[in-house]
Amino acid sequence: MAWNGIPVVDGDGHVMEDWDALLQYMPEPYIKSGRFKGRIFPPLDHLHSASLFQLVPGAFRQVGPEGWLEFMEDVGIERAVLYTTGGLAFGKVITLEFAVDVARAWNNWFADTYLKKSPRFQGLALIPLQEPQEAVKELRRAVTELGFCGAMLPSTGFKGHLGSKEYWPVYDEANRLACCIGVHGGAHEGLGMDT
């Protein structure tokens, strides 16, 4: 689990969400609506869906915590910082209440499925930056109650740039909690590739 005596940490691992299991963490009206079969987040972008590159068979499959632990053993990784995959498009969620509910559901699902399974997993929570005060609350809950090491912010989709003053309370709370904030690319609209 070390290379030349240095522990190996995967700082950008991605879980493939189990959508059916995740849906069970959403408030009852979402479950009953039947609208969220197979996916909760918006699609990343057309750049990903229209690409003709070939994937290795089995790539991007949902392996769960057992598959992750097996992989980590096979390649000698001591710990992994795990991110959402579907949630890379979380910035595109426009309904504030839905953003809050999805963040809470994803964080609860991930904590139950991964963080409680092994201390070798570290997680970056989703926080609803669409409503900064709610993001502060969810960051605090994710770190202090669920055991996340910080939060992930999608790089695109929000109304202001990530340095906007409206988001400063989130960064102040992260500083107070001594936790990390990771900004992760994934959705590419508005970055010059679509003009």
Language-model-detected regions and their locations in the chain:
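Helix-coil boundary/capping segments in enzymes
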Residues: M1-T195
